[in-house]
């Protein structure tokens, strides 16, 4: 039996640093801007004078390109970037809710509120409109529902492409829109603030005064 092939894992790039750089000369990217070709030993000395490391970043260039940077800080930044990317990949996912072409108003409002919440958290969403039995002959109702969803979610998202049929299911995808979500949150916070204000006292200025 053949062994199942697994995809190769990506490894972090490794850099030659300081004494590991054996070529006679290098092109140095200077921290203050610009580049300069110099002997490798001079570049190492320059790095030492600035309490930095000489790091080879483009070994295949002629001559190899190096930069002056703290090697420990470079590795830290790379690790942080990897962690942030993994965190983003974990939190962003596809959420799905199902509808029917004859979904009533209460069910529509309830499910749409959930889709809206998913989008506000930065997730993509898919609304799946399922046609049972002979209801497939009423495809127009599915498209009407898709348009209602698009209008309802337009405050936080954009529809990703046109609604698409696959068998007896109509799929509608939505992408969160950061600017729309920020505006939505501001308006909601303002509405909540106004709702929390105490009611104004009644205006009695127009009432006649009692005769003494």
From Swiss-Prot:
Single annotated GO MF: ribosome binding
Any one biological process term the GO annotation gives: ribosome disassembly
Region (Disordered): 192-212
Protein's cellular compartments: Cytoplasm
Coiled-coil residue windows: none
GO cellular component term, pick one: cytoplasm
Keyword list, A-Z: Cytoplasm, Initiation factor, Protein biosynthesis
Keyword Transmembrane appears in the UniProt entry: no
Location (main, coarse): cytoplasm
Record has Protein biosynthesis as a keyword: yes
Known role: IF-3 binds to the 30S ribosomal subunit and shifts the equilibrium between 70S ribosomes and their 50S and 30S subunits in favor of the free subunits, thus enhancing the availability of 30S subunits on which protein synthesis initiation begins.
Quaternary structure annotation from Swiss-Prot or TrEMBL: Monomer.
Protein name in the entry: Translation initiation factor IF-3
Lineage: Bacteria, Pseudomonadati, Chlorobiota, Chlorobiia, Chlorobiales
